Amino acid sequence: MAVARRVAGTYTGNPSIAALAVAGSVGAGLADRFSDLELDCYWVRPPTDADRLRPVKAVDGSLLALWDYDHDDEEWSEDYHLGELGVTVSNFLTGTIERFLDQVVEQADTDPVKHMRLAALQRSCPLLGAELMTSWRSRAGGYPDELVSAMVERALNPQVLGSWAAREALVARGDDLAVQALLSGIGYAVVGSVLALNRVYLPHTRLKWQRHLIAGLEVVPGRLTERLELLSAARHTEALQAAEALLTDIVLLAEARTGADLGPFREELSGRRRAIGPPPG
C-alpha cells in the first residue's frame, strides 16, 4: 500500500483527477506474493497521454503499454513496472460511472462490464476523492429486487445446460473435456446466481478469489463450498449427480426469493438422453 500511496501522490496536482483507488487484491486486502498493483483513476475529462505518462515518469516506472481507449470496457489503461512490481492503471470518466450506476441500479442492466466496475467501487481502497467514492458506493449498495431477478435469470440461462441431456453419453464415451466444460459452466452459473441472491456484484468474469467471494454469504444452499469442490474433484458420474442436486437446490432457493422465471432452466435440467439398447452386432 505504501507504493500505491507514492503513486497516488503524483496525481494530486492534476485538477482533472476526481478520484483514485487501489483496486484488485491489494485494494481488497487480499494481496499475496502473486499480486500486482492495480489502480483505478476517475477523471472529469478524457485523460491525455501526458496525464497518463506523467505519473509513470514521476515514480521512475518502466512503461510496458499505453493502451488506447477501449470502447467495450469504456476505459483507458497503461501497464508499467516499478522494479519487479507490475502496475496496471485503469482510467475512467466520472460520467461513465454515473451512467453505469443509473443503468444497473435503476434499470436492472446485467452487463458484466458495468457490474465489475460497481464491484470495484465497493472493494477498492480510495486514496484520492474519498467523498466521491463514498457517494458512488452508497448508490451501488441499492441493489434492487428487479436486478436480483434479472441476474439470477442471466446466471441460470438454459444455455448453461446445452449438453446436460447427453451427460451420461459423454461419460460413457470418455468425453472428459466435454464433461469438464459442462461442470465448469455449471459452477459459474451456481456462483453467479448465489452472488445475485446476496445482492453482490460480480467482481470478475473468471471468479478470482472464489473462496473469499462466497465466504460469509447468507443466502446459499447448504455446504456450498464443499459441493462446488465436488464438481471438479469427484469422478464424473459423482460430480454430475452433485451438480444436479446443487442446481435443483439453487432453483428452489431462487424461486422462493425472487420473481425470476426459471421455467426454461428447469425444463433443461430435467432432460436426459436415454440409451436405446446395445448397438447392432
Where are these regions (language model features)?
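Alpha-helix boundary recognition
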Residues: 12-13, 35, 172
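Conserved nucleotidyltransferase catalytic core and NTase-mimicking acidic/glycine-rich helix/loop elements
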Residues: 135-281
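Catalytic metal-binding acidic patch
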Residues: 22-60, 72, 80-91
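Helical scaffold of the NTase/Pol beta-like nucleotidyltransferase catalytic core
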Residues: 1-21
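Short, solvent-exposed loop/turn segments at secondary-structure junctions
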Residues: 27-28, 94-95, 201-202
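Short secondary-structure capping/turn segments at boundaries of alpha-helices and beta-strands
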Residues: 6-8, 24-28, 65-66, 75-77
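Conserved NTP/Mg2+-binding pocket subregion across the NTase superfamily
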Residues: 58-173
